Amino acid sequence: MKTLRLNFRSAILKALGALLLLQGCLAHAQVQELDRVVAVVNDDIVLYSELQDRASRIKDKLRQQKTPLPPEAVLHEKVLDQLVLESIQMQMADRGGIRVSDSQLNQTMQNIAKQNGMTLDQFQQALSEEGVTYQSAREQIRREMIISRVQQRSVDSRVRVTEKEVNDFLKSASAKEQRAEEYHLAHILIALPENPSDAQRKEAESKVEKIRSQLDQGVDFKQLAITYSDASTATQGGDLGWRKPDQVPSLFADVAPKLAPGQTSEPIRNSSGVHFVAMLEKRGGVSKVVEQSKVRHILVQQNELRDEIAAKKLIEEIYGKVQAGEDFAELAKAYSDDAVSAAAGGSLDWVNPGDMVPEFDQMMRETPVGAVSKPFQSTFGWHILQVQDRREADIGDRLMASQARQVLHRRKYEEELQNWLSEIRDEAFVQLKL
């Protein structure tokens, strides 16, 4: 009830502000339309001046894009619906303790300026030239960040991407084309007749051993092909050119894709003789070697009972316990708000660069193996993390699967977001007065 009274009081003050504005206008004998309430949304209101301001900005943007303007009534209806939904979500954020700190907002403003190739001062000047104050732009960005967090917290948990969906996506024609590799191969053949004598076998094996020995010494494969190979490509250094997977001779089909550039196969024997195949180069495909970190963390989030200050205080207390020698895994099980990792003692297993939100990713990179980070804040709340180990790994296949999962998640998220917005709109008390 206290929250309701405070919010209702805020709504009254908002309306009083509009009334004072009207009195000022009348004092200057200006004929203007009375600012009024155009929507009641639970215990908040939307004013006509807010509607006009948002509609004006949208019209300016449409003009810049040379897009025909819709009828005024249609535009106002759409904008009012947008403001109603924003009001509902901001009220949800207030109840859920979702905030954006000044430090996070400042960093976001810096990032926006950087993305536009400007310093922060230049960005402020550009806004001023467009008739927008930096403070109003800053608060609008804060509002958008808060709404985004409300949506993520509410909608993400409703989105599920199954392994079958990922696998089906990876089997699609577009995904296969993206994954296709090409191999630049070279080949040596030590030929044997159909029914070789013991002497012929012995001579062939002698050549094989010479080739193996010289390869171990670093002799160039092409030079060895010219010297020893009985294949028609010998004079070209055994070069088979670039081959797609389905163009690789069946004898090498299982071996060649597993070779790294510069690597030569073990001898391959068949009825025509003994073969060596070398991977000169690879191109295409999704091979990517990265440094992975084995990480565990503890997350403390804001909620109805814990505001940002309390969340920060709790993570600092947990950090103190870790520094005092208490077991990280047990503390994660007892305190972490990340239910999945908490059950595993905070373990996130092996994490690739870029898998996590930027704040987490940066702290993970900066924390030495075995060390525990100081408390830091991300969009999800307050964390501490420990880097348990690091390794290099080729994540090509996993990267493709991860990208497929992200594509599918985005598609489902957009669909589920619209469903969720409809639900919260239906569940809210909304009275339109336009």
Curated annotation (Swiss-Prot):
What does it do? Chaperone involved in the correct folding and assembly of outer membrane proteins. Recognizes specific patterns of aromatic residues and the orientation of their side chains, which are found more frequently in integral outer membrane proteins. May act in both early periplasmic and late outer membrane-associated steps of protein maturation.
Q: Which InterPro entries match?
A: OMP_Chaperone_SurA (IPR050280), PPIase_dom_sf (IPR046357), PPIase_PpiC (IPR000297), PPIase_SurA (IPR023034), SurA_N (IPR015391), Trigger_fact/SurA_dom_sf (IPR027304)
Q: Which is one Gene Ontology cellular component term of this protein?
A: outer membrane-bounded periplasmic space
Question: Which gene is annotated as encoding this protein in its UniProt record?
Answer: surA
User: What span is annotated as the signal peptide, if there is one?
Assistant: 1-29
- PANTHER family recorded: CHAPERONE SURA
Name assigned to this protein: Chaperone SurA
Give the record's GO biological process terms: Gram-negative-bacterium-type cell outer membrane assembly; protein folding; protein stabilization
Q: Per UniProt, which keywords does this protein have?
A: Chaperone, Isomerase, Periplasm, Repeat, Rotamase, Signal
Chief place where the protein resides = periplasm
